[in-house]
Amino acid sequence: MGKEIIIRDLTVSYGGNGNQLEHISLDIAAGEVIVMTGPSGSGKSSLTRVINGLIPYFYEGELSGEVFVDGKPLKEIPSWERGKIVGNVFQDPRSQFFANEVAGEVAFGCENYGYSHEEIRNHVHRAAADIKIQDILDHSLHSLSYGMRQKVAIASAEAIDPEIYVMDEPSANLDIASTYRFADIIRDLKQQGKTIIIAEHRLYYLMDLADRFLCVQKGKIVREFTAQQMKALTNQEIQTLGLRTPDLHQIERTEILSAATSEVILEVKNL
C-alpha cells in the first residue's frame, strides 16, 4: 500500500532568485494518483524534488515548511531509507541510469541495498515481468527507444518496491502509442495501491488515471480539478490556466492542420 504525504506551508527558493514555491499546503492520500500541471517554470518540478528529498540535499535551495510521509517528517528520514520509500522516474531516463545493460540497471538499487544474489535475481525478474521487459534484459540501454528506456527506469524503481512514485514529465519524449503503453504501467501501479505524483504537461493519457489534477502557477497551487472537471473546461479556460488540452482528438487535429499548412523550408531535387 502507498504512503500518505502531507505538506504544510512549504516555501522553496534558489539562491536569491525569488521563491520557486510559496506556502504550499497539500494532503495526498495513500494510494492516490496526483497530477501537477501548469506552465513551464511554475514550480511543478521543484515540488517533486521536495517530495523525493532531492531538495535541499541534491539541488541547493532554501526550504521552509514541513513534509510528512506517513506522519514522519521527511527531513528525519535518512537518504538511504528515502530511496526505498520513493521511486523516481525522470523526463530523460538516461539521467538516472548507472549501468550499460538493462538487467544491471534494474538490479542496481537492489545491489546498493545489499540484497543477496538470490533476492536480486527475484526482484529483477519480478519487476521485468510486471513492466513487460523480460525479453530485453540482456540488451544495451543505448540500443533502446525512449519508450523502452522509460520502461527500464520504472522497472529499476519497482525492483525495490517503493510505496511512492514521483514522475517528472515522464511522457515528454514519447509518441502517442508509447505514451498509452506508459499509462498502462501507471494503471498497474495504481491497482497495487501505490501513491503516485506526476508533474506533466500532457494530460490526455492521465484523464482516466488521476484522482486529482493540481494547477500550479508561479509557485502556488491555484486550482484543483477532478478528471470530470478537467474534461469540462472550455478551451478558453484551459488557455487561461496555461494548460495543454486533455482532448487527444483536438491534439491530433492540430497536428494534422499544422502539417498540412507548414511552409516548406528545404527542398532537394535530383540529388
What do the predicted segments below correspond to?
Residues 1-7, 12-23, 55-60, 78:
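A short, flexible loop at the N-terminus of ABC-type nucleotide-binding domains that lies
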Residues 118-136:
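Conserved ABC ATPase "signature" region
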Residues 165-168:
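Catalytic Walker B motif of ABC-type/P-loop ATPase nucleotide-binding domains
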Residues 140-144:
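Conserved ABC ATPase signature
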Residues 200-201:
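H-loop/switch region of ABC-family ATPase nucleotide-binding domains
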Residues 66-81:
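ABC ATPase NBD Q-loop/coupling interface
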